[in-house]
């Protein structure tokens, strides 16, 4: 940590500037929530907070249930990596998202595979045939990808991805309660 450390002063309001180089390499965007805590040896640590990552067991249960009942492979992502997957999407678990997929998520609307499938993660050959954003209190927190199975997805499959995204978004709203206002 000392090799990449930079000394910064705290201003009168208690603010610390995180240098652009660190924000870029750690993929910290404007508005991203950061968890601040003190380690046992007195270090103040800033950690990216992923609301979707916090509920990865629930996300895994949702996508596994959809896969068992309907045979539809889904993958759940936060804004940086895949947190849960079922079926063919398991190869993408814990992998960073591909930049093309990140651009789809940032559009904040359902994407239905036009012009063709998009790679979900770097380092995995898993592609999305459709994608539904996960929104919580109006904030984009992740996505549910319908994993490509070789043919164009049907309306029912896309609906299952949208339903899963809506359920996870609503659960996040319930869990976060009033925390979202503090992020702004």
Give residue ranges: language-model regions.
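A short, aliphatic-rich beta-strand micro-motif
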Residues: 128-135
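Structured interaction and signal-relay segments at domain junctions
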Residues: 63-123
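Juxtadomain coupling helices with adjacent low-complexity linkers
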Residues: 56, 60-65, 100-103, 142, ...
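A short local loop/turn or secondary-structure capping micro-motif enriched for an aromatic residue
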Residues: 27, 53-56, 91-95, 121, ...
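Short, small/polar residue-rich loop motifs at catalytic or cofactor-binding pockets
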Residues: 3-4, 68-71, 126-128
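Intrinsically disordered, low-complexity terminal regulatory regions
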Residues: 7-84, 174
């Amino acid at each position: 940590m000392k090799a990449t450390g930079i000394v910064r002063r705290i201003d009168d309001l208690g603010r610390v500037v995180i240098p652009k180089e660190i924000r870029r390499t750690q993929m910290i965007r404007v508005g991203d929530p950061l968890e601040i805590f003190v380690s046992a040896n007195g270090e103040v640590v800033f950690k990216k907070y992923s609301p979707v990552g916090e509920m990865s067991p629930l996300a895994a249960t949702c996508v596994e249930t959809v896969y068992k009942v309907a045979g539809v492979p889904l993958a759940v992502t936060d804004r940086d990596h895949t947190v849960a997957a079922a079926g063919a999407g398991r190869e993408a678990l814990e992998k960073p998202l591909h930049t093309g997929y990140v651009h789809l998520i940032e559009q904040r609307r359902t994407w239905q595979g036009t012009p063709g499938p998009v790679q979900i993660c770097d380092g995995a050959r898993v592609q999305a045939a459709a994608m539904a954003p996960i929104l919580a209190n109006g904030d984009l927190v992740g996505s549910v990808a319908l994993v490509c199975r070789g043919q164009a997805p049907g309306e029912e499959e896309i609906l299952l991805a949208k339903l899963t995204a809506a359920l996870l978004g609503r659960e996040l709203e319930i869990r976060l309660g009033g925390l979202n206002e503090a992020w702004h």
